[in-house]
């Protein structure tokens, strides 16, 4: 009568004879269901971990009436919820104030921070996958190789959705976690100096000099056999629907920014009698900034040797 009954899970696919389960006898179907029933994978437990945060700080300060100092050190580390995801930060701050005499004050401060983060370069939401993935599915085959997920993408096609193309090894989320990576490293540093001089009782000079540096770098790697690499195959062109060729890639971005500022000013002030006050300010400021960024992507990348061999287009194109 044209009625379509949806396939529910792996058992529905087996009973309906979908895909690789076609032409199975009832006994073979029962044996396959029993085999799958021996496996119970808790995907939330496999994919996620307890998020632990550690922070440590140390500060020192001291000095005398004329000179004082302050130094602060910090370190923090956070493990993300998804396995192989973490974040680290290092920072140091220092400040020195000096008064050589009653007319001169000098202050110098420096700050530096380094942040590093690593995570898999996943193109599938791990929370969604853990919720919908079949507990019958295995992570590894008996020989230790990655086991292909036979239902996460296939079940939608079995129920009439678009057939998502997969590499020969199928999809395995742990292959994506272990063979893709996204590493970022950011650093910022600044140096500031302040000078104050009372030239006369009613004439003073204020000066400031500062310099800042910021750099950001990231490496995104997709291993050759990953689904992320499978979805990024520009050298196949219109043949990508039938081509099985795969190649890894690395995407690198580097950017940095420098800035400086110089400022000086003379301030004159005086009071005449009881009701008259005069104030004059003369100053100058120079500032500048420079930034540069580089983007690079290489296909055919080998993470072990660091070399890449760019694929060529098929002759049919």
Per-range role (PLM):
Residues 47-48, 55-77, 81, 93-99, ...:
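Predominantly transmembrane beta-strands of Gram-negative outer membrane beta-barrel pores used
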Residues 41-51:
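Periplasmic N-terminal accessory/gating domains of Gram-negative outer-membrane beta-barrel systems
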Residues 55-57, 192, 250:
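Short structured motifs
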Residues 192, 197, 211-213:
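Alpha-helical support elements that line or immediately flank enzyme active sites
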Residues 62-64, 75, 98, 195-197, ...:
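Residue-level signature of outer-membrane beta-barrel architecture
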């Amino acid at each position: 009568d044209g009625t379509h009954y949806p396939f529910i899970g792996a058992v529905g696919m087996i009973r309906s004879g979908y895909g690789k389960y076609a032409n199975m006898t009832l006994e073979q179907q029962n044996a396959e269901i029993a085999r799958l029933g021996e496996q119970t994978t808790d995907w939330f437990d496999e994919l996620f971990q307890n998020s632990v945060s550690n922070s440590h700080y140390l500060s020192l300060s001291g000095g005398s009436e004329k000179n004082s100092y302050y130094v602060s050190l910090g370190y923090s580390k956070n493990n993300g919820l998804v396995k192989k995801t973490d974040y680290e930060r290092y920072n140091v701050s220092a400040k020195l104030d000096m008064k050589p005499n009653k007319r001169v004050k000098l202050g110098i401060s420096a700050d530096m921070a380094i942040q590093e983060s690593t995570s898999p370069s996943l193109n599938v939401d791990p929370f969604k996958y853990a919720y919908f993935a079949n507990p019958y599915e295995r992570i590894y085959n008996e020989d230790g190789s990655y086991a292909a997920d036979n239902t996460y993408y296939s079940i939608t096609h079995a129920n009439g959705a678009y057939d998502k193309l997969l590499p020969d090894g199928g999809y395995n989320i742990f292959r994506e976690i272990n063979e893709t990576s996204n590493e970022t490293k950011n650093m910022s540093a600044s140096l500031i100096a302040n000078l104050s001089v009372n030239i006369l009782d009613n004439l003073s000079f204020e000066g400031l000099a500062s310099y800042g540096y910021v750099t950001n770098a990231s490496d995104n790697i997709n291993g050759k056999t990953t689904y992320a690499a499978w979805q990024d195959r520009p050298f196949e062109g219109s043949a990508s629907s039938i081509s099985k060729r795969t190649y890894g890639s690395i995407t690198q971005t580097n950017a940095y920014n420098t800035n400086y500022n110089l400022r000086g000013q003379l301030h004159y002030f005086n009071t005449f009698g009881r009701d008259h006050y005069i104030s004059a300010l003369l100053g100058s400021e120079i500032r500048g900034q420079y930034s540069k960024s580089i983007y690079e992507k290489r296909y055919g990348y080998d993470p072990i040797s660091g070399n890449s061999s760019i694929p060529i287009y098929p002759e049919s194109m």
